[in-house]
Amino acid sequence: MRVYVLNGPNLGRLGTRQPEVYGTTTYADLVELCQRTGRELGLEVVVRQTDAEHELLGWLHEAADLGAAVVLNPAAWSHYSVAVRDACALLRAPLVEVHISNIHAREPFRHQSVVSAVATGVICGLGVDGYRLALYHLAARHR
């Protein structure tokens, strides 16, 4: 099973951006975690990150066309991007929304995600381990 692990704006800065919120794991470490977990579970994992919304939309369309499952950290786009939400709604396979921090324990403008309503499930506040848990969930659903 193919799984796209898609990451939105500023996640390429993991390890240096607000380590008190996002931890010290780098983006390269996150990619390795996802790929290693995917290998252990027999998943074909494709990990991508972008700061350009149109690029994320293209990847979501690609996943929809291929019937691939998605682990998505939409980052700031989760709070306001109807375009990202609508692209997620096109997916035919499961979508797990992941946030490294607990968005409900942060500033009020971060409490709502427009993506959550079209996601199969949401994991937040568990650090980068949320990605691993999302991949385990998708593998279990596939069996």
Swiss-Prot record:
Q: Indicate yes or no for the key word Amino-acid biosynthesis.
A: yes
| Catalytic activity as recorded in UniProt | 3-dehydroquinate = 3-dehydroshikimate + H2O
**A GO term, aspect molecular function:** 3-dehydroquinate dehydratase activity
Q: Main EC class of this protein?
A: lyase
Pathway recorded for this protein: Metabolic intermediate biosynthesis; chorismate biosynthesis; chorismate from D-erythrose 4-phosphate and phosphoenolpyruvate: step 3/7
Q: Where is the active site?
A: 22, 99
Biological process terms from the Gene Ontology for this record are: amino acid biosynthetic process; aromatic amino acid family biosynthetic process; chorismate biosynthetic process; quinate catabolic process
Which PROSITE patterns has this protein been placed in? DEHYDROQUINASE_II
Give the Enzyme Commission number.
Answer: 4.2.1.10
| Binding annotation for substrate | 73, 79, 86, 100-101, 110
Question: Which domain of life does this protein belong to?
Answer: Bacteria
The feature of type site (Transition state stabilizer) is located at: 17
UniProt keyword annotations, A-Z = Amino-acid biosynthesis, Aromatic amino acid biosynthesis, Lyase
Q: What does this protein do?
A: Catalyzes a trans-dehydration via an enolate intermediate.
Query: What quaternary structure, including any partners, is listed in this protein's UniProt entry?
Result: Homododecamer.
- Record family assignment: Belongs to the type-II 3-dehydroquinase family.
State the protein's name. Answer: 3-dehydroquinate dehydratase
The primary gene name is aroQ
